[in-house]
Swiss-Prot record:
Gene: rlmL
PROSITE patterns cross-referenced by the UniProt entry: THUMP (PS51165), UPF0020 (PS01261)
EC nos: 2.1.1.173, 2.1.1.264
Protein name: Ribosomal RNA large subunit methyltransferase K/L
Main location group: cytoplasm
InterPro entries with a match to the protein in the record: 23SrRNA_methyltr_KL (IPR017244), DNA_methylase_N6_adenine_CS (IPR002052), RlmKL-like_Mtase (IPR000241), RlmKL-like_Mtase_CS (IPR053943), RlmL_1st (IPR054170), SAM-dep_methyl-trfase (IPR019614), SAM-dependent_MTases_sf (IPR029063), THUMP_dom (IPR004114)
SMART domains the UniProt entry points to: THUMP
Family indicated by similarity: Belongs to the methyltransferase superfamily. RlmKL family.
């Protein structure tokens, strides 16, 4: 009897133990990452041919402590290597793990190799050759907590490599993990199995091989035991003959049928190719189709199991398409597959909440480095009638959004706007803002207070996303989701992503670039559009200054409005480059359109030029490392006005705006400075922000001895 160890993915050890016991293995003992068991040659070959869950089956040779490289060398030399393979066989060492003595796995492999070679030369034999590509003998050395387990790998390549998969989709499952998913799904051989997002078909192919009693190892071209001295060729051939006979009989007798769907026809061709190589193509029907159009292929009354590994994203809030996909899947399951079992395996378990289904059981497993979860559902026997997303969830939100769209439609068409707000936390339980940017939509989720259950908040976001897609009839690929909280200092300028994708939009004749994904804000504050149009009208023949210029949209309006010059000052090089791009897109090039990178407050204190029109929309608060002092708009606005007065020409106009809730303009202080102000907040608030009286505050300010407001009415 041989003492063996079968490895598997973490989380699958108990399944592997059960499988090995079914094959006849004795003394099975579960360990982290595998199962120890006893087997003679016949059972060893059966396990190699028939185990669907094992990654490797190895023969442990020695376990020893390593406190130095000398300990490693001596522990390897303690094995009688010439009794395991002959000198004419090529070998390779695969070493994993480090400790204080062996700090590099390559060094560890080298020491093991040297010890093996020296074992042969010590007995007068020549040095055996090393072959890393396809060795005859594979030696595994695993170092963990100063203990080395030295083994002979009898598998060769990993057992999950059945030999049938020539190509896979973007994120293939390993075959042994696919088997675990199928086994845990509750599917029984002889009953239908369907995968609505089957990719390269691994789940279906492995299930078909189970149903047809196909030995998974039959199609493997390479084994690690062939050059092992303990190999029994006659017993191996007998095991092969038995496996071939069982496979042939099983394929002829199975009544199981399998159905695979995927939106990508090219990936389905790979799936068909894989199924042919595995010998189960006759059992599986592959068809191109997307989840939303999925129809139950079985006659009414027949039941089966749906198993799938849906796509997932690392950042949930940036993947509205995935949220929509999961919600569509849940709706289709309820409407088309009443009475079926559903089992989904995901590296983003939170996405499964979008199914709107209650799981009856869940399992944990690793897919490579990813922590994953498999959830099983029993679908209600009575199928629900297909309906729109908003008809089933978030009805009040969907109705409000639809009402807003209708009420704004004529105004949007009249103003010829690409960008406008559709919803602004109108209903407290759906605390989001929804903005349209041409054919794109941005949902900004205001972060819920800590008193709100995170799961409930996430579910409401799912509802908002799906209802928005349905009401606006846009593809999920045109939806962007962001989380917004109260901004502090420079956080509004921090980068969220690295896509670098820009969209050109129009606003009252100005062409402006927006970026919907990379930053919290898009590069265009759409609540200020009327203020920007006013600046354009005010700036004809004038010199225009834009402080805290951001992406320069106000400078663009001034420029196309006929300003003699524009000067845009901002501390961010990124935003000034963006502003230059905006200016160029409107033909505003040349020395008369200046871009200055500077701390606006420091620049203002030093500036000697004067201007006819000044626009300033400062941050509510700033403590940037590149600014000498903090800035608070309520505390410091009078000092700011005193500096701006120096730069404002006689008869000139200053537009001052800010977003601080509860801000109070110190009109008495302004009068003491020789300035006067006129509130234009209501005039600059457009219909899409009519219900948000706190979106911004805005004033026109001029020298007290000049009447400059008449032309702005």
């Amino acid at each position: 009897m041989n003492s063996l160890f079968a490895t598997t993915a973490q989380g699958l050890e108990e399944l592997l133990r059960s499988e090995l016991e079914t094959l006849g293995a004795a003394s099975c003992k579960v360990a982290l990452g595998g199962v120890h068991f006893q087997a003679d040659s016949r059972l060893l070959y059966r396990a190699l041919l028939w185990s669907r869950l094992a990654s490797r089956i190895v023969l442990p040779l020695n376990v020893f402590s390593v406190g130095s490289d000398g300990d490693l060398y001596r522990g390897v030399q303690a094995v009688d290597w010439p009794s395991l393979f002959t000198v004419d066989k090529r070998f390779a060492v695969y070493f994993s793990g480090t400790n204080a003595a062996i700090r590099n796995s390559q060094y560890g492999a080298l020491k093991v190799k040297d010890a093996i070679v020296d074992s042969f030369t010590r007995h007068g034999a020549r040095r055996p050759d090393v072959d890393r590509q396809q060795p005859d003998i594979r030696i595994q050395a695993y170092l963990h907590r100063d203990q080395v387990m030295l083994s002979l790998d009898l598998s060769g390549s990993s057992l999950h490599q059945r030999g049938y998969r020539g190509a896979a989709g973007q994120a293939p499952l390993k075959e042994n993990l696919a088997v675990a998913i199928v086994l845990r799904s509750g599917w029984k051989p002889g009953t239908p199995l369907l995968d609505p997002m089957c990719g390269s078909g691994t789940l279906l192919i492995e299930a078909a091989m189970i149903a047809a009693d196909c030995a998974p190892g039959l199609t493997r071209p390479y084994w690690g035991f062939s050059a092992w001295s303990g190999h029994d060729e006659a017993q191996w051939q007998e095991s092969l003959d038995e496996a071939r006979a069982r496979t042939q009989t099983g394929l002829a007798q199975t009544s199981s049928r399998f159905y695979g769907f995927d939106i990508d026809g090219r990936v389905l061709e790979k799936a068909r190719h894989n199924a042919r190589r595995a010998g189960v193509a006759a059992l599986i029907t592959f068809q191109t189709g997307e989840v939303a159009q999925l129809i139950n292929p079985l006659p009414e009354g027949q039941r089966g199991t749906v198993v799938s590994n849906p796509p997932y994203g690392e950042r949930l809030e940036s993947e509205p398409a995935l949220i929509a996909l999961h919600n569509q899947l849940g709706r289709v399951m309820k409407s088309q597959f009443g009475g079926w079992r559903l089992s989904l395996f995901s590296a983003s378990p939170a996405l499964l909440g979008a199914l709107m289904l209650r799981a009856e059981r869940s399992f944990s497993a690793k897919n490579g480095p990813l922590d994953c979860e498999q959830k099983n559902y029993l679908l209600a026997e009575t199928a629900t009638a297909p309906g729109s997303v908003e008809g089933q969830i978030a009805t009040d939100f969907a109705n409000r959004l639809r009402k807003n769209v209708r009420s704004l439609q004529k105004w949007v068409e009249r103003e010829k706007l690409d960008c406008y707000r559709l919803y602004d936390a109108d209903l407290p339980e759906y605390n989001v803002a929804i903005d349209r940017y041409s054919s794109w939509v941005v949902i900004q989720e205001y972060v819920a207070p800590k008193s709100v259950d995170p799961e409930r908040a996430r579910q409401r976001l799912y509802d908002v996303i799906n209802a928005t897609l349905a009401v606006l009839a846009i593809p999920a690929s045109r939806l962007v989701v962001k989380a917004r909280e109260r901004q502090k200092g420079k956080s509004q300028y921090e980068k969220l992503a690295q896509k670098g994708e820009f969209l050109l939009v129009e606003e009252y004749g100005a062409k402006l670039w927006v970026n919907l994904t990379d930053y919290l804000d898009t590069g265009l504050f759409i609540d200020h559009r009327i203020a920007r149009r006013m600046l354009g009208e005010m700036s004809r023949g004038k010199d225009f200054l834009n402080l805290f210029a951001y992406t320069g949209s106000a400078s663009v309006h001034a420029g196309i409005g006929g300003a003699c010059s524009t000067t845009s000052v901002d501390m961010s090089r990124t935003y000034l480059e963006w502003a230059e791009k905006n200016l160029r897109s409107n033909g505003l090039v040349g020395r008369q359109h200046r871009l200055i990178q500077a701390d606006c407050l420091a620049w203002l204190a030093m500036a000697q030029e004067t201007f006819d029109v000044i626009f300033i929309d400062p941050p509510t608060f700033s403590n940037s490392k590149r600014m000498a002092d903090t800035f608070d708009v309520q505390r410091d606005h009078l000092a700011l006005m005193a500096q701006l007065k120096r730069l404002l020409r006689p008869g000139g106009t200053l537009m001052f705006s800010n977003n601080k809730r509860g801000f109070q303009l110190d009109e008495a202080g302004l009068a003491a400075l020789g300035l006067r102000a006129q509130s234009i907040t209501d005039r600059t608030r457009s219909p899409d922000f009519a219900h948000n009286r706190q979106i911004h505050l805005c004033w026109l300010i001029s020298h007290a001895d000049k009447d400059t407001f008449k032309s702005c009415h």
